[in-house]
């Protein structure tokens, strides 16, 4: 994920509730209770809830983005390089992918199998490097990191809006503005250092399993290091891009 993507749910309800109170002047007690209930619900979102929210958030993002059409050079290239992964599923969800036409250098994946790659990233990297990055993003889904990020995005959106219609569906409980806020929070989330490292390893192991070139992970981080001066990466500020490149090279040298 970009150097925006990372949240954690530790002490979530208390910290978000207190942080949000300063902006809740004039809200009645029922409104505050509703916000607290939504935040508590976020920590207990089921896998089915995550898929449902991801479906809605991905659709929202697609509507707000310029998607490369099927005949576009970026779409053709992504389709070709994704063939190496075969019929991938993430936690039982079939992977679906699209390209956003934007100069931003980014990519992300959601719990419903939604994978989105930005053309700015595709301009920067070759196919092996892109497979490494995409494998990393899919790793966040497979390892449960995106579930935590979606739980937090849901809680933050509920806290900011402090409202939501009653209903059985977590999506139905969100207004259109809340859904937009949730989508933005998820895409701009950040993962912990340990999660980023685990996603790197997932991608390396996936590329190994699929018999694809793992060197792309090394050179992808090297390019990001040049892009950001070696201080951070599109995924995270910790560990740094050079450190991650070196770690992947060590795994290559060790033959595992």
Please identify what each model-predicted range represents.
Residues 2-9, 16-256:
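A Zn2+-metalloprotease active-site environment signal
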